Curated annotation (Swiss-Prot):
SMART domains: DEXDc, HA2, HELICc. It catalyses: ATP + H2O = ADP + phosphate + H(+). The keyword Amino-acid biosynthesis does not apply. ATP binds at residues 246-253. Residues 1-111 are annotated as: Disordered. GO terms for cellular component: U2-type catalytic step 1 spliceosome. Changing residue 845 to L: Temperature-sensitive; decreased interaction with SPP2, decreased cell growth on benomyl and decreased splicing at elevated temperatures. It comes from Saccharomyces cerevisiae (strain ATCC 204508 / S288c) (Baker's yeast). The lineage of its organism: Eukaryota, Fungi, Dikarya, Ascomycota, Saccharomycotina. This is Pre-mRNA-splicing factor ATP-dependent RNA helicase-like protein PRP2. Belongs to the DEAD box helicase family. DEAH subfamily. Signal peptide: none annotated. Residues 233-399 form the Helicase ATP-binding domain. It is found in: Nucleus.
């Protein structure tokens, strides 16, 4: 059945037709009786229909009407089911009967019979009619679609493009309007009230978005840097290097790059502007904010690039936020950074290793690129040192928007600053009025998660006796969607507590903070050249850092800072400025990069602070052991290959050995997986590592083999989210692992390792024990300095200069579980990935070395003499 509805004035007239298929070439429309009034209308309509001969087929007849408006009404609805008469739109009277006619395509009949219209049945009748309308609507849509499909199939032929007509010369060829395809808008199926609701929701969404954009633009104008826009641009044009000093929240990071784009520094998209950040979280979050302000898609005009992740578009991105290490690596492919018109080194006061090396390299290329602009952004008072390094270049000061902050010290030192911080949180929460959020500085992910758990336990016990509290963590390995929660507005009658690392000192601006709790500690890497080991230490902050932390409380109004240390400690125990990373870290990766760029005299390379001679000497020694340098200190072919990988030289050596060494060939795929997993282990597990390990493998002897098995099982599940949930693994972390692995695989393919590995793999098969032995040998070749030996009192480090340091296996390691809880015999030799000092020296991510001769086979220049000497001493 098909119904056609037209309007005459305000009265709706329903016309219904029954379509009967006579043959493949003709369609006849006959009126269907729907009562006297409808039958009369249908007959009138049918009498107006005429048969029209098709120009394409003289035997084919189409139904047509000469009534203009009604012709269009007839098109798409002739094959539908019966529509309801307009009388059903009015109040239902007694003895009405609703019948759904059987359609052309043989669908089952949908009949609804109604009882007499006594007043007590009016509600029931109304409900049934409503259901019948819905059923009829579905039937009409289904019948129409099936009929269109049959029509299309009926017109098919073996050669649909070959049209042969008898007597074709007798016809004029024009586009026949009867052959047009009828379409319906998806909104046509909406009831009037539904359409009104849809349009209202759409209008509201558009209005909300317009208000949001206007709010963003208004907020931009309120930032302190906005009033200095013209003056700042003039100074940039006048000077090749400019130091910009401004407090966190002044807008220099987000607004200045936009000013440069608006002023034409990108030459209509031909050039880019690079803004470096010391941390991944800052690069990604700031890029997202700027893209939002510019009303563009993140990854197009505005993008970011961090290690193992590139969210930019070639020939499209003009603003690129990136970690300083990523810009440093671009020197390998473009030593003059020719695609950039301006480079902004943001948060330069943090003095990361990559930032210091970048500044030295940029100082060298500035004379070669006179049009390149260099902006050094700093939030502290050490801007003068940067100015002196660049021949006393000018300093532009952007005043911050800062309210007074009251500083509170403890009367005596606190033995447990975590416990003291939790106590202070509830002290503020229960005594201070709303609004006013709390920012707590902690040293790392473990402290943050432990504090978060404790706060949630206490809040659950307090229940409704205190105001609601929202706890939001922020640290580097937190998934990005969870990181963004710290920027969400705090609901009314609620307080937000942000648990953060030192990333919140300057890199991020969090609105709504009125209270800061500062234990005064930070976690730093400390490299000891004499032992050749890097330790992760928790150390006191500098005075500059704690002052920056206090300033976070004065962004939206007068605030308070609670320091969990005494004023005497602040004045006498804290260093004035933090130590530059270049003076306290392993420089092997940096030295290799500089040598690959052609820097031969490391002593004379321009640096703001010089590393110690022992540190440089130890780095050169490590590179020589890895085979990256020859005996003359010149970079080797292997060393140049290592530079192609976005990871430490030690990991690059592992991958190289896995594909080329005759005793290890064929395990590149496994080593790629393990290396990728080791980059993300801090955020890999939900809860305890041992629980996840037990669900993956019943028995495993090493952390490295556990990581390999986790990835393999996840891959076998087709990278399933549910598999991760079942095995207590972070799904987002595994996605990052997969991205890292893909990038490392592409690098391996580029330097020819994949082809060599495939050839060797065919010879060794897939025996697990054989594969694991080769994996262990590969890691020995890459980390010969990270091997400990079991002694009378436990494990001790090896090496002539670094031997004898007592270390313990960290409780999170599988080795600890095997030795302490399963009483398995400890292995004589163990390789570790990280040495950290907390209550004592711990080693993490451990790999068992079952055979002593593997050490001699893989690194004879170190272990042959060491093992022989110990053997001889034992015999004496």
């Amino acid at each position: 059945m098909s119904s056609i509805t037209s309007e005459t004035g305000k009265r709706r007239v329903k016309r219904t037709y029954e379509v009967t298929r006579q043959n493949d070439n003709a369609v006849r429309i006959e009126p269907s009786s729907l009562g006297e009034e409808e039958d009369k209308e249908a007959k009138d309509k049918n009498s107006a229909l005429q048969l029209k001969r098709s120009r394409y087929d003289p035997n084919k007849v189409f139904s047509n009407t000469n009534q203009g408006p009604e012709k269009n009404n007839l098109k798409g609805e002739q094959l539908g089911s019966q529509k309801k008469s307009s009388k059903y739109d009015e109040k239902i009277t007694s003895n009405n009967e609703l019948t759904t006619k059987k359609g052309l395509l043989g669908d089952s009949e949908n009949e609804t019979k109604y009882a007499s219209s006594n007043s007590k049945f009016n509600v029931e009748v109304t409900h049934k009619i409503k259901n019948a309308k819905e059923i009829d609507k579905i039937n009409r849509q289904r019948m129409w679609e099936e009929q269109q499909l049959r029509n299309a199939m009926a017109g098919q032929s073996d050669h649909p493009d070959d049209i042969t007509l008898e007597g074709s010369d007798k016809y004029d060829y024009v586009f026949d309007t009867d052959a047009m395809i009828d379409y319906t808008n998806e909104e046509d199926d909406l009831l009037p009230e539904e359409k009104l609701q849809y349009e209202a929701r759409l209008a509201q969404a558009l209005e909300t978005e317009e208000k949001r954009i206007l709010t963003i633009q208004e907020a931009r104008k309120l930032l302190p840097v906005h009033q200095y826009k013209d003056e700042l641009l003039q100074e940039i044009k006048k000077n090749q290097v400019l130091i910009i000093m401004g407090e966190t929240g002044s807008g220099k990071t987000t607004q200045l790059p936009q000013y440069l784009v608006e002023d034409g520094f990108t030459d209509q998209g031909k050039l880019q502007i690079a803004i470096t950040q010391p941390r991944r979280v800052a690069a990604t979050s700031v890029a997202a904010r700027v893209a939002d302000e510019m009303n563009v898609v993140l990854g197009k005009e505005v993008g970011y690039q961090i290690r193992f992740e590139d969210k930019t578009t070639p020939n499209k991105t003009v603003l690129k936020y990136m970690t300083d290490g990523m810009l440093l690596r671009e020197f390998l492919t473009d030593s003059k950074l020719s695609k950039y018109s301006c480079i902004m080194i943001d948060e330069a006061h943090e003095r990361t290793l990559a930032t210091d090396i970048l500044i030295g390299l940029l100082k060298d290329i500035l004379p070669q690129r006179p049009t390149l602009k260099l902006l050094i952004s700093s939030a502290t008072m050490n801007a003068k040192k940067f100015s002196e390094f660049f021949d006393n270049c000018p300093i532009f000061n952007v005043p911050g928007r800062r309210y007074p902050v009251d500083i509170h010290y403890t009367l005596q030192p606190e033995a447990n600053y975590i416990h003291a911080a939790i106590t202070t949180i509830f002290q503020i929460h229960t005594t201070q009025s709303l609004p006013g959020d709390i920012l707590v500085f902690l040293t790392g992910q473990e402290e943050i998660e432990r504090t978060k758990t404790k706060l949630e336990e206490i809040m659950s016990k307090l229940g409704s006796r205190t105001k609601q509290m929202i706890i939001t963590p922020i640290y580097a390995n937190l998934p990005q969607e969870q990181q963004l929660k710290i920027f969400q507005p705090t609901p009314e009658n609620c307080r937000k507590v942000v648990l953060a690392t030192n990333i919140a000192e300057t890199s991020l601006t969090i609105d709504g903070i009125r209270y800061v709790i500062d234990p005064g500690f930070v976690k730093e890497n400390s490299y000891v050249p004499s032992t050749g080991m890097t330790q992760l230490l928790t150390v006191p902050c500098s005075r500059a850092s704690v002052d920056q932390r206090a300033g976070r409380a004065g962004r939206v109004g007068p605030g308070k800072c609670f320091r969990i240390f005494t004023k005497w400690s602040y004045l006498h125990e804290l260093e004035l400025m933090p130590k530059p990373e270049i003076t306290r870290t392993n420089l092997s990766n940096t030295v290799l990069l500089l040598l690959s760029l052609g820097v031969t005299d490391l002593i004379k390379f321009p640096l703001m602070d010089k590393p110690s001679i022992p540190t440089l000497r130890k780095s050169l020694e490590n590179l020589y052991i890895l085979g990256a340098l020859n005996s003359k200190g010149t970079i080797t072919r292997l060393g140049k290959m290592m530079c192609e990988f976005p990871c430490e030289p030690e990991f690059a050596k592992v991958l190289y050995t896995a594909a080329t060494h005759e005793q290890c060939q064929g395990v590149l795929e496994e080593c790629l997986t393990i290396v990728s997993m080791l980059h993300e282990t801090p955020s890999l597990f939900i809860g305890q590592k041992r629980d996840a390990a037990a669900s993956v493998l019943s028995e495993v002897e090493s952390d490295h083999i556990l990581y390999l098995e986790i990835f393999n099982q996840w891959r076998n599940s087709k990278f399933s989210r549910s598999w991760c949930q079942d095995h207590k693994i972070q799904f987002k972390t595994m996605l990052r692992v997969r991205n890292i692995r893909n990038q490392l695989f592409r690098c391996s393919e580029k330097v020819g390792l994949v082809e060599k590995n495939d050839q060797a793999r065919m010879k060794i098969g897939n025996i697990a024990g054989y594969i694991n032995a080769r994996i262990t040998r590969c890691f020995i070749s890459g980390f010969p300095m990270n091997i400990v030996q079991l002694g009378p009192t436990g494990y001790q480090t090896m090496g002539r200069s670094s031997g004898g340091l007592n270390v313990s296996v960290h409780p999170t390691s599988i080795l600890f579980v095997n030795h302490k809880e399963k009483a398995q015999r400890p292995s004589k030799y163990v390789l570790y990935q990280q040495l950290m000092l907390t209550s004592k020296e711990f080693i993490r991510d451990c790999l068992v070395i079952p055979k002593e001769e593997w050490l001699i086979d893989m690194v004879p220049q170190i272990f042959k003499d060491l093992i022989d000497d110990k053997t001889n001493r034992g015999r004496r």
